[in-house]
């Protein structure tokens, strides 16, 4: 791999782009979404942040950037400190401001999750994301105004207390973070609550969704969404054994 390639950038429909950390393994890296507006742009989740992401983004867009994290886990919020305008839910504001390996679940990441280290002496087993105090607290019903488009904040707790999604009604697009993706759903973490997680998934079904851009894996539509939710409810996509659910 070219040592200079730290992020890949792929344009999708509706002025949305997918950014990926090229040196983080596919099974661990999160999807970083770039939503372009007429007056400002939105970055949804920021990855591990082991490499400078803002330099690449500012070469692509000259508009002001809002960086919003769907939750405070290290693989989504590690790069948040690189941005001046930082949005997140109040339930996890203390984690963003005072992160530890335990509170951000960085104690789960292993050396094999990195294809290449940011520098030779780097030890992922000791790494913790930088503090990133939230400048813009967002809650259920708040609207992120990008000029020619708006995204509504939805609170979907369960995976974590402050997990949020973003809904663009005009295009039927939902950004779900770790509330829903095509994989085994993490409902076993220290602040996960499976029963609340289920309620959030039932609520997700109510939206007239065309496309889900998730926190991990490929994007998908409503039919696939319903299959994933049904499989989770039956225990197939849960990290917990039946007695724990």
What do these predicted ranges mean?
Residues 25, 92-93, 218-220:
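Short histidine/acidic/glycine/proline-rich micro-motifs that form metal-
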Residues 50-143, 224, 230-242:
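Active-site HxH/HxHxD metal-binding segment of metal-dependent hydrolases
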Residues 41-43, 48-49, 129, 133-136, ...:
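Metallo-beta-lactamase
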Residues 13-20, 122-127, 147-149:
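Short Pro/Gly-enriched beta-strand edge/turn motifs at strand-loop
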Residues 11, 18, 69, 87-88, ...:
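Structural signal for conserved beta-strand scaffold positions within catalytic alpha/beta enzyme cores
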Residues 39, 62-64, 209:
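A general structural motif
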Residues 6-59, 165-181:
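Conserved beta-strand hairpin/beta-sheet module of binuclear metal-dependent hydrolase folds
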Residues 1-3, 26-28, 72, 128-130, ...:
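Short solvent-exposed loop/turn micro-motifs enriched in small/polar/acidic residues
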């Amino acid at each position: 791999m070219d040592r200079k390639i730290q992020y890949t950038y792929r344009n999708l429909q509706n002025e949305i782009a997918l950014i990926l950390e090229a040196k983080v393994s596919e099974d661990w890296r999160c999807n970083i979404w770039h939503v372009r507006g007429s007056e400002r742009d939105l970055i949804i989740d920021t990855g591990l942040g082991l490499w400078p992401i803002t330099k690449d983004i500012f070469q692509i867009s000259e508009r002001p950037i809002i960086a919003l994290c769907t939750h405070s886990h290290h693989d989504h919020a590690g790069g948040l400190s690189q941005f001046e305008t930082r949005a997140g839910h109040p339930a996890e504001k203390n984690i963003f401001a005072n992160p530890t390996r335990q509170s951000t679940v960085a104690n789960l990441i292993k050396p094999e999750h990195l294809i290449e280290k940011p520098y030779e002496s780097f030890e992922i087993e000791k790494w913790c994301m930088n503090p990133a105090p939230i400048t813009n607290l967002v809650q259920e019903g708040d609207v992120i105004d990008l000029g020619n488009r708006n995204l509504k904040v939805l609170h979907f707790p369960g995976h974590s207390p402050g997990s949020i999604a973003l809904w663009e009604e005009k295009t039927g697009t939902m950004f779900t973070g770790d509330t829903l993706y095509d994989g085994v759903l993490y409902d076993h973490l220290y602040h996960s609550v499976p029963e609340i997680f289920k309620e959030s998934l039932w609520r997700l079904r109510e939206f007239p969704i065309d496309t889900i851009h998730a926190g991990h894996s490929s994007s998908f539509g409503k039919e696939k969404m319903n299959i994933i939710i049904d499989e989770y409810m039956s225990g197939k996509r849960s990290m917990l054994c039946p007695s724990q659910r």
